[in-house]
């Protein structure tokens, strides 16, 4: 997991003009940051594991740490829990909620409606590739304007 989180950052570091003279120092900085990110993801005990030794939720959290290592302005998630069983889904959603609490800007495509309502500052409801409705979680979830939005949300509120 540690090497996975470090890889992209190390490849980028090799393009720095002073890389050859600061190689060890740069490597140590990247490693320290990667360890910190894995700890933040709850994976301190899995740093030396390979992907085949990790659960789906753990692999997803390694991927989040790898993305964070590059210090992006925006993190994009496309159904981050769709391939996970319910127990592992909670682990990943907890990490994403923590990022939201730190005011990390994220775009999340999800069918986890309760999660979207609780974590989002802005919600967009799309149908057939088109934006049908957007607004605050309260506006979209509690007072939807569009019939299609109401129809979709009724599946989650009426059982």
Outline where the language-model segments fall.
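Conserved signature/switch motifs of ABC ATPase nucleotide-binding domains
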Residues: 49-52, 70, 102
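Conserved ABC ATPase "signature" region
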Residues: 6, 10-14, 18-45
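Hydrophobic anchor residue at the start of the ABC signature
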Residues: 64
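Catalytic Walker B motif of ABC-type/P-loop ATPase nucleotide-binding domains
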Residues: 75-78
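A short, surface-exposed alpha-helical micro-motif characterized by mixed small hydrophobic
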Residues: 116-118
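H-loop/switch region of ABC-family ATPase nucleotide-binding domains
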Residues: 110-111
């Amino acid at each position: 997991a540690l090497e996975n989180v470090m890889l992209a950052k190390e490849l980028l570091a090799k393009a720095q003009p002073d890389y050859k003279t600061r190689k060890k120092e740069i490597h140590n900085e990247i490693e320290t940051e990667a360890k910190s990110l894995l700890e933040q993801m709850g994976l301190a005990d899995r740093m030396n594991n390979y992907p085949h030794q990790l659960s789906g939720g753990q692999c997803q959290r390694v991927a989040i740490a790898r993305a964070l290592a590059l210090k992006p302005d925006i993190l994009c998630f496309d159904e981050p829990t769709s391939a996970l069983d319910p127990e592992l889904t909670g682990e990943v959603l907890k990490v994403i909620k923590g990022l939201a609490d730190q005011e990390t800007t994220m775009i999340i495509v999800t069918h986890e409606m309760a999660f979207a309502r609780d974590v989002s500052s802005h919600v967009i409801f799309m149908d057939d590739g088109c934006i049908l409705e957007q607004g605050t979680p309260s506006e979209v979830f509690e007072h939807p304007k569009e019939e299609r939005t109401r129809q979709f949300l009724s599946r989650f509120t009426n059982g």
